[in-house]
Amino acid sequence: MKGSTVHTKWQAYCRLMRIDKPIGSLLLLWPTLWALWLAGRGIPEAKILVVFVLGVFFMRAAGCVVNDYADRHIDGFVKRTASRPLPSGTISEKESKILFVVLILLSFGLVLTLNSMTIWLSLAALALAWIYPFMKRVTHLPQVVLGAAFGWSIPMGFAAVSESLPLVCWLLLLANICWTVAYDTQYAMVDRDDDLRIGVKSTAILFGQHDKLIIGLLQLATLLLMVAIGWLMNLGGAFYWSILLAGALFTHQQKMIAQREREPCFRAFLNNNYVGLVLFLGILISYW
């Protein structure tokens, strides 16, 4: 294989795993760090932290691969996804399957260094990562499944650090699901016209003209759940300031999606990286 061909193939694999678009990894990373710091009431054990950070990137990459495999016959009809490696033929279906298996094996190898409770919970993480891409064909609520998939590192984090799943763990998971449905609805608003044309379901379609209101309510629920978590964990004032800052970011996002235009809706989605970061900094400073 010529050097230029190898380079082209490598670039295609990177695009398939979204290495060039880290936003998904970051949106998966922040809830993971929330959980690890809350479960350990401060900085978690270095080994656990490394395992989860690497796991975030491996599992996000695996999720992108299976998502593109599930959508390989419809991505060519959507403007934003038509040039992806599978619909464009740069990567074959067999190659994508092999890559998915490799990424899952790497992830599971990491989990095997943790306790048995975390290992068992990881099986649910695999199931959620696999079924999510197919949910948009059977329900208008695939974003709820995505929220569970993106948030499953939360119970895994608590299990790894404390070998327990307290109330705070489940409240944090619920907050993350609300947040994920909100930001992924913003993302789905970008593709709403294409999705309606090809018959793909999403919360953006389900919510219709009430989309902005429901996104706002989900964002409010996220903030209120975070307040409850702060109270239960006796977090300091820095955490509550971070909640206020997150609320300001949500308000800014509402302004961006006001006209339901593609580019501003996508920018609103990207802005959620700062929400996750701000909330993590609030937790971090509280345990300083």
Swiss-Prot record:
GO BP annotations listed: ubiquinone biosynthetic process
Superkingdom, natural source: Bacteria
UniProt keywords, alphabetically: Cell inner membrane, Cell membrane, Magnesium, Membrane, Transferase, Transmembrane, Transmembrane helix, Ubiquinone biosynthesis
Pfam families: UbiA
Pathways involved: Cofactor biosynthesis; ubiquinone biosynthesis
Main subcellular location of this protein, as a coarse class: membrane
CDD domains: PT_UbiA_COQ2
Location of the protein in the cell: Cell inner membrane
Transmembrane segments: 23-43, 46-66, 98-118, 141-161, 163-183, 213-233, 234-254, 268-288
EC number: 2.5.1.39
InterPro entries: HB_polyprenyltransferase-like (IPR006370), Prenyltransferase (IPR039653), UbiA_prenyltransferase (IPR000537), UbiA_prenylTrfase_CS (IPR030470), UbiA_sf (IPR044878)
Topology of the protein relative to the lipid bilayer: Multi-pass membrane protein
PROSITE patterns the UniProt entry points to: UBIA (PS00943)
First-tier enzyme category under EC: transferase
Gene Ontology molecular function: any one: 4-hydroxybenzoate polyprenyltransferase activity
Reported cofactor(s): Mg(2+)
PANTHER family reported for this sequence: 4-HYDROXYBENZOATE POLYPRENYLTRANSFERASE, MITOCHONDRIAL, PRENYLTRANSFERASES
Family recorded in the similarity comment: Belongs to the UbiA prenyltransferase family.
Function of the molecule: Catalyzes the prenylation of para-hydroxybenzoate (PHB) with an all-trans polyprenyl group. Mediates the second step in the final reaction sequence of ubiquinone-8 (UQ-8) biosynthesis, which is the condensation of the polyisoprenoid side chain with PHB, generating the first membrane-bound Q intermediate 3-octaprenyl-4-hydroxybenzoate.
Protein name: 4-hydroxybenzoate octaprenyltransferase
